[in-house]
């Protein structure tokens, strides 16, 4: 018999200490990594539920094991809510991650060696969009497209590459692009060469759900996303489509049994909660503030003489190009981290430095907005960051900035 008062603190002091330390770090550090966010206690309650005990290979109503009648209800709720939230006929909520969702799309629609057109990682794409170190770059013939000198996706170049190479699939989406993507134009290009349009909207799914960023769903054959990031749910993946039953069968088979076995029912329950939360008015207001805060920070960085890739942002993130400042992304990351400001070093277009050093940092506002930062707070934060970057290695500036960070974190806790 398992007693409900069993806990980690009394049993595993080392692990409990690590959890407590991470909890404190999240409260006392400003989180600016664009792919990170804080999920709600309701989502965490679902993830800590007894649904974790149930094996449920297959899909609702078509399981390989018995006793799935209640987890079927939970998964169907997640499916129905995802379809309603994003306006689609089909949703698969089982992928354990965004990368596994993307892998399933490749498996469903392509054969090894097929040609794919994807955004270059160096220009803002993602590992799973054809990077040579990833399965997508190893198993498929990848033709990269990028951005022009103004920092915008070059659709004319994309069309020329498509006409020349005749890809079977064109991939839209990004991990470090701050502008609006023209999904309609991408579909037109795909149709000219009879290619699938596959969009990975992981970074902007929350903005799309709230109407703050154009949706790719009416244009793409298949759309994937993570369920964390701007969507603020549990860590996991999601596949969406409106392309018909044949497509849905291929996608389902590619997830199970093609790439995964048993789904994580406790995480799927967390997704169901997050999708319901994303339909609330306060979620829409939150996403609007995410964009406003990003724009406020960009304006302040520019006022202080820092170059922003694409000269601004239309979503939740932006890249600060530090080449002219002769600061590496690695050094900027470390200095800001010492002031309790968490960012990630990031390559910028035509970066002369390696991906392990880089010449830029990526900044995102979902997490700070989640804890209540206003536009004025965002401007103050950008100024503090500029103070640190203007004085790289100055311990007094770093310490003074850290104290400001601790004060605002105390005023705006993540979990009150």
UniProtKB/Swiss-Prot annotation:
Biochemical pathway: One-carbon metabolism; tetrahydrofolate interconversion; Amino-acid biosynthesis; glycine biosynthesis; glycine from L-serine: step 1/1
A GO biological process held by the record: glycine biosynthetic process from serine
EC number: 2.1.2.1
Disulfide-linked positions: none
Binding site for (6S)-5,6,7,8-tetrahydrofolate: 121, 125-127, 245, 354-356
One Pfam family hit: SHMT
Swiss-Prot/TrEMBL site (Plays an important role in substrate specificity) positions: 228
Signal peptide: none
Essential cofactor(s): pyridoxal 5'-phosphate
Residue numbers bearing the N6-(pyridoxal phosphate)lysine modification: 229
Keyword Zinc-finger: no
Function: Catalyzes the reversible interconversion of serine and glycine with tetrahydrofolate (THF) serving as the one-carbon carrier. This reaction serves as the major source of one-carbon groups required for the biosynthesis of purines, thymidylate, methionine, and other important biomolecules. Also exhibits THF-independent aldolase activity toward beta-hydroxyamino acids, producing glycine and aldehydes, via a retro-aldol mechanism.
Alphabetical list of NCBIfam families matching this protein: PRK00011.1
Similarity-based family: Belongs to the SHMT family.
HAMAP family, per the entry: SHMT
Protein name listed in UniProt: Serine hydroxymethyltransferase 1
Naturally occurring in which organism (per UniProt): Vibrio parahaemolyticus serotype O3:K6 (strain RIMD 2210633)
């Amino acid at each position: 018999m398992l007693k409900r008062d069993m806990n980690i603190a009394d049993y595993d002091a080392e692990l409990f200490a690590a959890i407590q330390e991470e909890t404190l770090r999240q409260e006392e550090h400003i989180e600016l990594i664009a792919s990170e966010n804080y999920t709600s206690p309701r989502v965490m309650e679902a993830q800590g539920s007894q649904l974790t005990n149930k094996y449920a290979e297959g899909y609702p109503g078509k399981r390989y094991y018995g006793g799935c009648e209640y987890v079927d209800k939970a998964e169907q709720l997640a499916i129905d809510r995802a379809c309603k939230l994003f306006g689609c006929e089909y949703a698969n909520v089982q992928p354990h991650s965004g990368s596994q969702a993307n892998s399933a799309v490749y498996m469903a629609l392509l054969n090894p060696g097929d040609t794919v057109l994807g955004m270059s990682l160096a220009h803002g794409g993602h590992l799973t969009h054809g990077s040579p170190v990833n399965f997508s770059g190893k198993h498929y013939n990848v033709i990269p497209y990028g951005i022009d000198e103004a920092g915008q996706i070059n659709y004319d170049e994309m069309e020329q590459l498509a006409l020349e190479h005749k890809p079977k699939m064109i991939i839209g989406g990004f991990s470090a692009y701050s502008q609006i993507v023209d999904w309609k134009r991408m579909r037109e290009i795909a149709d000219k060469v009879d290619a699938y349009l596959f969009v990975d909207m992981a970074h902007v799914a929350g903005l799309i759900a709230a109407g703050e960023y154009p949706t790719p769903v009416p244009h793409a054959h298949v759309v994937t996303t993570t369920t964390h990031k701007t969507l603020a749910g549990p860590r996991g993946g999601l596949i969406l489509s409106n392309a018909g039953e044949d497509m849905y069968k291929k996608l389902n088979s590619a997830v199970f049994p093609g790439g995964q076995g048993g789904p994580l029912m406790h995480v799927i329950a967390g997704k169901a909660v997050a999708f319901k939360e994303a339909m609330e008015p306060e979620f829409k207001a939150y996403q609007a503030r995410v964009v406003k805060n990003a724009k406020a920070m960009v304006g302040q960085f520019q006022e202080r003489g820092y170059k922003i890739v694409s000269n601004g942002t239309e979503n939740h993130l932006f890249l600060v190009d530090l080449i002219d400042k002769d600061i590496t992304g690695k050094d900027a990351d470390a200095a800001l981290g010492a002031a309790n400001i968490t960012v990630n070093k990031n390559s910028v277009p035509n970066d002369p430095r390696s991906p392990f050093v880089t010449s830029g940092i990526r900044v995102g506002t979902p997490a700070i907005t989640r804890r209540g930062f206003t536009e004025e707070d965002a401007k103050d934060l950008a100024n503090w960051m500029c103070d640190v970057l203007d004085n790289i290695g100055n311990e007094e500036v770093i310490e003074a900035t850290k104290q400001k960070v601790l004060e605002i974190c105390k005023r705006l806790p993540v979990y009150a």
